[in-house]
């Protein structure tokens, strides 16, 4: 009973809140075992309480560790994100095939910033500029070298902030026309949208999209598009800018080439009242406006209209076509033009120079077959040439045909054509033709030759210095070769006026040489012994022997005239060495054995063999108008052959002298020789001396004297 009583009171007490502690008090003594058994539970609760205390003590440190790891993770993610953006912004990093590491990205970014800001130089205050140049001079030199003009426009509005004065020679516009206007007004209407896209710094739907050539798909450029807002982002585009009508008188002379280049790269002829445009290549950077540390006046604030960015660029003429032809070297009339055809001969492009060559406008020829302008008799020939050039695949083929011009006349045209092939598909894209007016080209070449002859006609022979050549065997050989070139019959006609300028006294002196055509210098009964032996020529000076027929005169000119007559009669081949031609005034000489210039102790005389001379009896030799020495080929061979087996230099100097002499016989044949006065300058001072030259009085020695010298190879006429 005790047991249920002990059990029920707690159950009953549980229903009464106020009697919870009443049954516990009397059971305090009797429930020793139960209390003892309940102690572990109480102790367990305390341990759980102690465990709570331990967890509460470790909680803040664990939470702090978890927070620190989270912070580090977020920081690493942000750093990776920023470095990825930096890698996309640096062109050198984005161009790499594989993704670089973080250190490489940072290093390339620093190098890129230095190159953009110019901090690679130690001095950033402009001290790198040469000290001898001012800023204005440096600016003009840069623009002159670039052959363009500098301009600054607001990025948002396109308002022109600055333009250099070099815009005048490039676009033929005064600087004042650009100030107060916008760049949109200066470009072609079809290029306005393209220019607006280049000046825009914000992203649009087409910004940052690139075409993948491998797959043919359009991809997003990623973070590269953020460079449009980046300071110093580069701009490069081509547009058509309007040309002005500034007078050429205000342009410097050194800009003629630029003007010709601008007309060449123009977009063809324009109609009346339409503006002319030129293709301009603009390169520059987007910069902040106004620059850091610079304040602009209030009146200039309206120009920028609160724009934060501006475009600083240089505009240069873009050469659309630069054909290599003669008329590009000067301001002459064009003689050729370019044309492009398809494989069927249809004209797809024509050079504007066709207006000056054939008279047609480019639009009159576009879309038409070239056979329509060809002569009916030449159409088959031209058609075959086009078919042949397609088969040649890149080789040049030329053809000449008659072309119908604008004024219904036939013009002889030479067309040099070749094909352009696609390097990938190896298919013929089009045919390029260079069409040249043959007649006009020949006229220009003839005019060029006339100008050259005019320049040569003013050449004064008296101003030519004559060097003192040493008289020797080696120099004599050189003089013979030079004489062949000077006195040849095939002389250039451009020098006719130079030879026609010989004074009248020289003509008179040479005229008397044709009067004695049948005389004989050396008669068959001459007392001279037979040919001289072939001993070595010991002296470089040769003296003319005292022949009875040659009398010493009181002047050098008289001796020259007599020797000329003897040459016309006997065809003596003057060879060998002779003293140098002093080119000075020589006083009258009396009958001496040796003249003063020949400083040799004893005079040497070399008698000639009478059989060595073959006088001509043909009347052609005495006729002034006939061919000099017409029977020269029928003469007996071998001059001075008594001591040699073969005759060297068989009369060649004689022919040379006769050719030069025959030019003056027909003009002054009736005049008599006038004696020169003592002290007068010697004739032919301007000509180089020749071996065996009769003007030197040394033509009566034989070729035997050079028998032992091997520097004169034998040759036949």
From Swiss-Prot:
Location (main, coarse): nucleus
Lineage: Eukaryota, Metazoa, Chordata, Craniata, Vertebrata
GO biological process, one term: response to estradiol
NCBIfam families noted in UniProt: sensory_box (TIGR00229)
Protein's UniProt name: Aryl hydrocarbon receptor nuclear translocator 2
Superkingdom of the source species: Eukaryota
Modified residues (Omega-N-methylarginine): 42
Residues of the PAS domain: 134-209, 323-393
A GO term for molecular function: DNA-binding transcription activator activity, RNA polymerase II-specific
Region (Disordered): 1-20, 35-74, 548-717
Subunit and partners: Efficient DNA binding requires dimerization with another bHLH protein. Heterodimer with NPAS4. Heterodimer with SIM1. Heterodimer with the aryl hydrocarbon receptor (AHR) or the SIM1 protein. Interacts with TACC3.
A GO cellular component annotation in the UniProt record: chromatin
Biased composition (Polar residues): 549-574, 585-605, 642-651
Record's compositionally biased regions (Low complexity): 610-625, 658-680
UniProt KW keywords: DNA-binding, Methylation, Nucleus, Repeat, Transcription, Transcription regulation
Disease link: Webb-Dattani syndrome: A disorder characterized by postnatal microcephaly with fronto-temporal lobe hypoplasia, multiple pituitary hormone deficiency, global developmental delay, seizures, severe visual impairment and abnormalities of the kidneys and urinary tract.
Origin species: Homo sapiens (Human)
Subcellular location: Nucleus
Biased composition (Basic and acidic residues): 63-73
Domain PAC residue range list: 398-441
Residue ranges constituting the bHLH domain according to the UniProt record: 63-116
Resulting phenotype, residue 402 to Q: Does not affect the transcription factor activity
Role played: Transcription factor that plays a role in the development of the hypothalamo-pituitary axis, postnatal brain growth, and visual and renal function. Specifically recognizes the xenobiotic response element (XRE).
